[in-house]
Amino acid sequence: MNNADICYCGSQILFKDCCQKYLVGTQKAPTALALMKSRYCAYATHKVDYLLHTTHSSQQKDYTKTAILNWAKANEWQKLEIIAVTENTVEFKAYFLDENQQEQIHHEFSTFKKENDRWFYVDGKFE
């Protein structure tokens, strides 16, 4: 993907004007929704460090860089659908093709927490 491409999150905004600024660290995601969308983009672009840095410290022990990278690379990310949003939760569906090119849907209810003016992913419940 180059800077002239539409953002993976489905906003219909250029990637460079949407989630890329969060992934490269020039801005912090201002809301749980913005963080969730940027994390989807991080999976699509294999930005594992961003995923780890935006996971709440209480949960980081459950994630390894290698496991995240392997899962992100094994799948071809198709689209993101936002179902419902509150201040600190996001329900979404992430559509992707798995390593066998089979269409899959990851349906999650994610919880986020704001600390020191930064949003973090805490956990998710899956359908």
Q: What is each PLM-predicted segment?
A:
Residues I6, E81, F109-T111:
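Short, surface-exposed charged micro-motifs
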Residues D17-C19:
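Cysteine-centered loop/knuckle micro-motif
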Residues K21-A29:
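Short Cys/His-rich micro-motifs in 6-15 aa windows
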Residues P30-A44:
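Short, aromatic-enriched amphipathic alpha-helices that serve as compact interaction elements
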Residues N70-I105:
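Surface-exposed, charged secondary-structure patches
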Residues I105-E127:
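Short beta-strand edge/turn micro-motifs at domain boundaries
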